[in-house]
Amino acid sequence: PRIDALDFSLEWARFNPAAAKFPKGATHFELLYCLLVYDAATNTFVTYEAPILRRSKEDRSERLVQTLEGGPTKEEGLQYIPVLGLRFMEVLGEEEYANFGKDAVGIEVLGML
């Protein structure tokens, strides 16, 4: 994905849910994009989150943009750490079941800005 240097929005030109390796029994996943902003002077973090996205393994490829709530702006002296979280689940009608199998939950640090 590409991260915008000004507003930290995350964009996939072609986001394909079917390309993910779904654990046994999983039918859907939830994707969380967040930005950790670290201030070394005060040794504090502020966290910004985009709305959680849910996709099915049956969904098709799409252009996907995630924007952060609260509108962080880049400031000198702060460190910006974009992070993706992923959680697989099984959805049967109205019922949802968390998947606790191997590789059912993941987190990825996308670097430092």
Where are these regions (language model features)?
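Short acidic alpha-helical/loop segments enriched in Asp/Glu that coordinate divalent cations
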Residues: 22-29, 44-48
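Internal, hydrophobic beta-strand segments that form the core of beta-sheet-rich folds
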Residues: 28-39, 76-108
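Short amphipathic, basic-aromatic surface patches that mediate peripheral association
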Residues: 13-24
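Structural beta-strand segments of beta-rich domains
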Residues: 6-10
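Intrinsically disordered, low-complexity Ser/Thr/Gly-rich stretches
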Residues: 36-54
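Eukaryotic short linear interaction motifs
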Residues: 18-20, 40-43, 94-95
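A beta-strand/beta-hairpin structural motif
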Residues: 48-75
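Long amphipathic N-terminal alpha/beta scaffold segment
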Residues: 1-5
